[in-house]
Amino acid sequence: MKKMLFVVAAVFLLAGCPSMLPQQPPAPVEPVTPTEPTEPPKPIEPPIEVVPTPPKITSINWNAAIQPLIREMSVTDDLATGKLLVVDNVKNNSGGNIQAVNATNTIIDSVNSISALQTVPYAQMMSARKALGLSGEDSLGLRSAAIGLARYLQADYILFSTVDGKKDNRVISMQLMSVASGEILWSGRHKVE
């Protein structure tokens, strides 16, 4: 009997539950009448930032400063014809932008055209710097690193160049050093204009 009572109670309970949810009437659709297009609001523009102007790069006539020094160096008595020369990157101690790469390239071109020495080719120089763990752009600040690089390249001489002074009074200094002895064979200075 308990089973029967339980079945009847379950039937009444289930019969009382609605099987479908009550439906709501659909929302009324209102027709939209076209209106004249209005001008959209203009976006607010951010304030204009003033970009600072970069420092002016002054054009330096490197040939005028370097060629007289290379001519002076080429008549040094201790230089042997056809020997190999490592040209170190020009070191900038002037505090300004002097385009040291252009100066280095001018030195290499001047040595190749004026002097009886031969410069180490650029590709060979870069591969040697990479093999020794030196950066390609850096000047070889330590003489020992420069001499090590020159010995690795089997060069006979190394030429160091430095630009000192302020904007209106810059001077380029060069020193030619023997790789074998470490002796400074020649040094010279010239005003950079």
From Swiss-Prot:
Q: Which domain of life is it from?
A: Bacteria
Main location as per UniProt: membrane
Arranged from A to Z, the UniProt key words for this protein are: Cell outer membrane, Cell shape, Lipoprotein, Membrane, Palmitate, Peptidoglycan synthesis, Signal
Which PROSITE patterns does the UniProt record give?
PROKAR_LIPOPROTEIN
One GO cellular component term noted in the UniProt record for this chain:
periplasmic side of cell outer membrane
Record bears the keyword Glycoprotein: no
Q: Which Gene3D superfamilies match?
A: ABC-type transport auxiliary lipoprotein component
Q: Which PANTHER family match?
A: PENICILLIN-BINDING PROTEIN ACTIVATOR LPOB
Subunit comment for this entry? Interacts with PBP1b.
Q: Which family does it belong to?
A: Belongs to the LpoB family.
Q: What is this protein called?
A: Penicillin-binding protein activator LpoB
Organism per entry: Proteus mirabilis (strain HI4320)
